[in-house]
């Protein structure tokens, strides 16, 4: 079921299922609901409680915040609905393996919320493994229901939902209701030197005016941007005598402060402004929002649509005010193009004109997940013969492309590094080194997590940071500035007190892939189109005109390489992140021999600065064209001894498989 945010998908899925369950109660848990976050599960929990008051169908949540006595009640008398995250479900499969049949033998339905979040991700592949493992404990094949507000590739979603199941999939198309859409996009060129007061920064002053006295959600792509925005808004509000209505919501904010932000947003009588990352992109009910603010370009059309869908509830128009920015390029050596502005327009146009959303492509060789499910399966079973282990693991849906030879190589490696141990009977058990990995609660998750430092003041936890600060450092967290007073490196605990001014954040971010189609649309907007889009505000329109004039001057409509002074050239591949990184890798590994390239600096996924030993622009462009058309084998994309470690458990995978997985 796919339909816009707050359009009733949850009720549409649950009401007929609950009717069936009420008519013929299950003898175990009847419905398994899998959601991406504890917050969404808690939100659904309260909504379902109201639906089920008269039906005598209990609703249970199972995650780290649920009291142990509540879990014991479910184990003693399993029935009704169980709401759970993939990580908690993994823990259930491992730690309650002997009770799984009693818990799930009469499981009728599996409901997976926010399907688009899971598809193509490690967590989504983990869910497919979990459902296949659960099937060994159920009397019949449970029916699966997927819910999503943003879905572009129905065929991929149907394949994903049906993986490992013999059931067919229906995907009813819901017509659009003709909901009105309000968009605006403004742009700012920001000086290198930050003004002393946020009120003197036109960017933040504009943001303040757009949110003043309103119920607004500000989305940013990085935690540091949410912190900087709220710190600036609070400073401006204090200077002008306005109340502090500002909150921050992301994964490194303490749960109590996140809940306070959610409550403030739900209050129908008072204004509130919360800056968030993906944590509020999902379907938590925040009540009637007046507007969504997006800082800089979203990474995908799917993210744009998901964030836009947070507004326009209860029949009102959907509204998003986008604000892009760029640093002053003069004298910096950077290409003077407003990439965030151009990417914002490209994403808007791909949705408005084509209703296009990014397709989902699961990994071909998910070796990190293979390690995880091998250890999880063996931990749950206690011991297994190698053939039994191989059968139980390699029959899981994500591992169809994994050969017996590859799996044999993995098992030999795990024996060699003591993650597995072989008994005299030939059976395999978890080894001493492996026990240290699987014995940590972090093992339940297949996504990368950082070992963060918790930050406290004298009364409460504020949140966490990803690197250790020094005493006296200033840091921004929860939209406020703090001075570090004490650091306990062993306990990873930081004590702070409030401080004036603004400061840096202590997080490291990771890059997100942008699709080829977005960059192709960006090029079309820059060098082919003359359209002046109605949603552009004066600053954005003026900057777009300047960018087009510069692109025309550089003849970018017919050239992809332009001189950049001396033996330095600027290359515009006009391709997405994965293709860009592949080209960059080819140039680094083979550009010296074939094109005389001495150095490559990538500004992914927009342009490359290439330094050569000599030659003309035309020669370099011809050489790059020939090089990019050649078919490069996997080994040609890797340095001789390179073993890329990109996923959580890659450090336990033999190098031969890491290389194969990287190029696969």
Language-model regions, residue ranges each:
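Conserved segment of the helicase C-terminal RecA-like domain
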Residues: 269, 302-359
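Conserved helix-turn-beta segment of the N-terminal RecA-like "Helicase ATP-binding" lobe
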Residues: 41-63, 159-166, 237
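Conserved strand-helix element at the start of the C-terminal RecA-like helicase core
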Residues: 30-44, 146, 208-236
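Conserved helicase ATPase core of P-loop NTP-dependent helicases/translocases
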Residues: 69-72, 251-277
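Conserved interdomain linker/interface between the two RecA-like ATPase lobes of SF2 helicase motors
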Residues: 132, 143-222
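Conserved helix/coil segment N-terminal to the catalytic DExD/H
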Residues: 64-108
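C-terminal accessory/connector segments of nucleic-acid motor ATPases
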Residues: 355-481, 486-487, 563-578, 593-602
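Conserved SF1/SF2 helicase motif Ia
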Residues: 19-44, 137-141
